[in-house]
Amino acid sequence: MVSQTQLRLLAVGTTTALGLAALSWQKHEKRGRGLLFSPSEGTTVDAARTLNRGAGLLATSVALDSALEHYRGDFQNRAMYTPLAASTLSLLASGQGQQDPDAFASKVRDPIYVLTGLTGLVGTGFHLYNVTKRPGGMSWSNLFYAAPLGAPAALVLSGLLGYYSEQLRNTSGDAEPRVMGLPAGKSVALMAAAGLLGTTAEAGLLHFRGSFQNPAMYLPVTAPPLAATLLATSALTSPRRRRLRWASRLVLRFTAFMGFAGAGFHALGIARNNGGWRNWRQNLQAGPPLPAPPSFTGLALAGLAAHSLLDEEKELAQYRWWK
């Protein structure tokens, strides 16, 4: 049995370790090594491939999480197989896109990402119906224990990140790269910031249900909103604010590491349930969702890709009106 004091020490130690890891990564980039696993192509294609990685992480999280949750629901509705297929396709497309150095959109990946996003939207509708059809409608009890509203939204985000990556490839030769009508860096930054806030809302709801019994449960409701705020502010203010951008990158890196650490904490939560991992078939379904936290990592990678685009845009005279 883990005591509350031990949990506090674990939370403090983990936060310190994540901060040091983020600082180390920050210094690593300063020495000119670029983004982690950075390709050797131009900035726009580099950012597109980083978005592919983010989309793949989100797709992996959704595939595993929906498999567990829908298995628990005995796949009563045959539509419950759809997110498994869509997330698997998104994962395969993202893996191929991460290896693709071409500066133009794929005719295969692009429609897969659109289909993935649409599947997530339809899934959100199904989950909303599942919540509202129960006695009490949109009550706290139903939000806690009915179909999670945020789960299919992660599939929407996977599709969005992938779609943005393909749009970036198409604009890589343009003098003024734009995505969805906005400068590419600004567009990707705002999308990633919105995704971080939405994912935080889902984590906050479930951690509130768990009464924040582990102090580390406060991390995913504090670091990602801070990362989203700094990222959006960096995109909407003057590129001369170097300290702001430095802080934004640092918190995004912290959030990226936090996503993987969160999976470890969820594994600990499963181990603390009755029977622990010996009773894995039950505890994987009843305990905290093991595949969920890396969604933060995927969105943090998207934020870092946005920063590389923002830095590139800073050097272009035609964007200086945007300070």
Annotate each predicted stretch with a short phrase:
Residues 1-323:
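Short amphipathic, positively biased membrane-proximal segments
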